[in-house]
Regions:
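Active-site C-terminal subdomain of aminotransferase-like
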Residues: 1-52, 56-59
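Short, glycine-/Ser/Thr-/acidic-enriched flexible segments
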Residues: 4, 15-16, 22-29, 63-64, ...
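Generic non-transmembrane alpha-helical segments
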Residues: 44-52, 75-85, 121-125
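PLP-dependent enzyme catalytic core of the Aspartate aminotransferase-like
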Residues: 79-82, 93-127
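Conserved PLP-binding catalytic core of the aspartate aminotransferase-like
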Residues: 54-83
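A short linear hydrophobic-aromatic micro-motif
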Residues: 53-56, 86-92
């Protein structure tokens, strides 16, 4: 019965693990390059957001995600969502002291042009 279940959490975890294994196997030695790409894209996004007035929350090492302070973050996030963006995780939902902070993530699926457009949209929606 468990083997045929499609809504069982264990089945879902197994399918997610299988998908990850297939993806990583296809990458092979390219996983290091993928990690470097992700980090470079996140660094670009962090820099572009900072240039538009969104300060990084922490000055610490990061990989492909970072926290940024955006004035009126909940309002800005709603505006971004209405424009079709997935702006990140609102940290204020978890920590009251970070009510104007968002966790942003960049992966190999995010290109430089999309990062620039996102940073422009954040600046526009924050006005």
């Amino acid at each position: 019965r468990r083997e045929k279940a499609t809504s069982n959490i264990c089945t879902n975890q197994g399918l997610c693990a299988l998908r990850a294994i297939i993806y990583l196997s296809a990458l092979g030695n390219g996983i290091r390059e993928l990690a470097l790409i992700n980090h470079r894209l996140a660094a670009r996004c962090k820099k572009e957001l900072a240039a538009r007035g969104c300060a990084p929350l922490f000055d610490r090492p990061y990989f492909n995600e970072f926290a940024v302070r955006i004035k009126k973050a909940p309002t800005v996030m709603k505006r971004l969502e209405s424009e079709g963006y997935v702006p990140g995780v609102h940290l204020g939902d978890y920590y009251k002291e970070y009510k104007d902070c968002v966790m942003v993530c960049c992966t190999e699926m995010t290109g430089p042009a999309e990062i620039d457009a996102f940073a422009d949209a954040v600046a526009r929606c924050a006005k």
